[in-house]
């Protein structure tokens, strides 16, 4: 049985990781061992932040709705309660877009909500 050296396969594996860590700072882009650790950690951060992104955007939408609703003399919680009571099922993303991009439609919605005592 002949001996098989692993230089070619390891070089390919190293090049693959170093290519993925190209823009990293310092040894993280040059040294394979450190680059591999940085690559693994980057994957962990990416996985975590894909989950956190959903939370962050929900917070942003709520802040936008709250600030727009307070200009009309309502609180966010009161507005959401009344909107559910009217059976208007618009999610927070669409409500925040209305508040920012289409102020006339949002003010009409608030008039409708204010008509309920």
From Swiss-Prot:
Name of one Pfam family that matches: Ribosomal_L20
**Which keywords does UniProt give here?**
Ribonucleoprotein, Ribosomal protein, RNA-binding, rRNA-binding
Superkingdom = Bacteria
Q: Which GO terms describe its cellular component?
A: ribonucleoprotein complex; ribosome
Q: Name one GO biological process term.
A: translation
- What PROSITE patterns does its record include? RIBOSOMAL_L20 (PS00937)
Q: Does the keyword Ribonucleoprotein apply?
A: yes
Among InterPro entries, the record links this protein to:
Ribosomal_bL20 (IPR005813), RIBOSOMAL_L20_CS (IPR049946), Ribosomal_protein_bL20_C (IPR035566)
State a single Gene Ontology molecular function.
structural constituent of ribosome
Q: Which protein family is named in the record?
A: Belongs to the bacterial ribosomal protein bL20 family.
Biological role stated in the UniProt entry: Binds directly to 23S ribosomal RNA and is necessary for the in vitro assembly process of the 50S ribosomal subunit. It is not involved in the protein synthesizing functions of that subunit.
* HAMAP family associated with the record: Ribosomal_bL20
Task: Tell me the protein's name.
Answer: Large ribosomal subunit protein bL20
Question: Source species, please?
Answer: Wigglesworthia glossinidia brevipalpis
